Regions:
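Membrane-interface helix-loop junctions in multi-pass transporters/channels
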Residues: 2-454
Length: 454
């Protein structure tokens, strides 16, 4: 259940029912329900995976409406209404303090479901799932290419801002840019993009921004520093990286809010409504959707064809060119797995759903990618050939770079930091950094120290 634009107001369609439920509960029970909703919301602030599909979202929404209508739904206090789990797929995820919330009402949510009937008539669940994967693949490859360009631009060869043996690691600029754009596309304007196309918002936030940023590369750079005995640089690398990424998303949210305010001043309310309604009828029309899907599929085929051709030409010579084209070929599976794992965000552990505030999907994706990258780095050190270096680096940059993400992680971190339980943000960050670094040390650093690899 989503609140209206004014956080303190309730949706008309169920406001009286929610107030009646709220007044009928004891204070302790009300507080527990509020904490449960907040825990689930912050955990789903970045991504909810394939639960965003219309079929699963519609069933969740229908069951929620039924429970509220019967007076059995989870009550929500008037003073602390938070977006529900269902809302994450169709509304902007924002800090819970109210600084950046742009939720939509239940009436708008129902209208949004009605506007999608044309798409649902022609898209079976399997075709819908394939459509999401096509969007994720296309935007995931674009994210890899953008990350490569930023790495080269700020790296030693051009601007010289970042390097391999510095706390300003090579992927820092892409993590900052991705976190900044997450504030725009994944928080403030997420609801607006959803009203244009649900596939587009997932393609941009999960596909593009999730692949533009990478946690596994960040963790591996810190492991390389620790192997060389630069422990102070290692600690500072994690600290400064988190500080810059977290403030990048804050800067993104605030600038996006300013831009939204400017648009509101420039456009009248009536013209804004007309614009929104026309956009809903546009891309959510099934013919338009299928046309865009075919176009994306063709462009994806072109990208894969070019990548395969270039890889064949440059593989024997090695170098960053061959590694990039291999990365483009293996990037989509990394995005798909991360999107699949995101379904476990907000679920908690066990049947009781304990620790719902921990995004276990994102946590699993980041830690597993970091461990696999560390293992491949160990193999690369042991084999030490040009062919192995091309294969390992390409897989690390493409598949593992897309499997892990900083933009989603930092969106969850920011939501926790803005919630009532600020400590959860730092506990989540410590959990991610600690487990990834310790496991990476066992897989990579220890073998390097024992065998004396260069």
């Amino acid at each position: 259940m989503d609140p209206d634009t004014n956080v303190g107001d309730e949706p008309r369609s169920s406001g009286s029912s929610l107030r009646w439920c709220s007044l009928s509960l004891a204070g302790s029970g009300l507080s527990k329900i509020s904490d449960d909703i907040e825990s689930k919301t912050v955990s789903e602030a970045g991504d909810i995976g394939d639960r965003a599909c219309h079929s699963s979202r519609r069933s969740d929404f229908g069951s929620f409406r039924s429970s509220v209508g019967n007076g059995t739904g989870n009550p929500i206090p008037d003073s602390n209404i938070l977006p529900s789990a269902t809302s994450n797929s169709i509304t902007p995820d924002a800090p819970l303090s109210g600084k950046g919330i742009y939720p939509v009402s239940t009436e708008e949510l129902e209208n949004s479901e009605d506007k999608k009937q044309d798409v649902e008539k022609v898209l079976t669940p399997s075709l819908e799932y394939v459509s999401y994967r096509i969007y994720l693949s296309f935007f995931g490859i674009l994210g890899v290419l953008t990350r490569y360009l930023l790495q080269k631009l700020f790296g030693p060869s051009i601007l010289g801002v970042t390097s391999n043996q510095s706390i300003l690691y090579l992927d820092l600029p892409s993590n900052m840019v991705g976190s900044f754009l997450m504030g725009w596309l994944g928080v403030v304007f997420k609801g607006d993009i959803c009203r244009v196309s649900d596939y587009l918002v997932i393609g941009l936030s999960t596909g593009y921004l999730g692949s533009l940023t990478t946690f596994s590369g960040w963790n591996q750079e810190m492991l390389n520093l620790s192997v060389d005995g630069k422990w102070v640089f290692t600690v500072l690398g994690f600290f400064i990286g988190l500080f810059l990424a977290s403030h990048s998303i804050i800067f993104g949210i605030e600038t996006a809010q300013g831009f939204r305010w400017l648009l509101t001043r420039l456009n009248s309310t009536s013209s804004s409504k007309n614009s929104n309604s026309s956009s809903k009828r546009g891309l959510n029309n099934h013919r338009c959707h299928l046309a865009i899907l075919v176009a994306l599929l063709l462009m994806l085929g072109v990208l894969w064809s070019v990548s395969g051709t270039q890889l064949k030409e440059k593989f024997n010579s090695g170098g960053s060119g061959a590694q990039l084209w291999l990365a483009c070929l293996v990037a989509p599976p990394g995005v798909w797995i991360r999107w699949f794992l995101a379904r476990y965000n907000g679920r908690g552990l066990g049947s009781a759903g304990i620790l719902k505030w921990v995004p276990f999907g994102t946590l699993t994706a980041n830690i597993s990618a970091a461990c696999i990258m560390a293992a491949l780095s160990t193999v690369n050190k042991a084999v030490n050939t040009k062919t192995c270096d091309t294969l390992v680096t390409g897989i690390q940059f493409g598949f593992l770079g897309c499997l892990s993400t900083v933009s989603t992680f930092i969106a969850e971190f920011n939501a926790m930091r803005e919630s009532k339980h600020t400590w959860r943000a730092y506990a989540y960050a410590l959990m991610t950094f600690g487990l990834s670094f310790v496991l990476g040390t066992l897989v990579y650093s220890v073998p390097v120290w024992i065998n004396g690899y260069n």
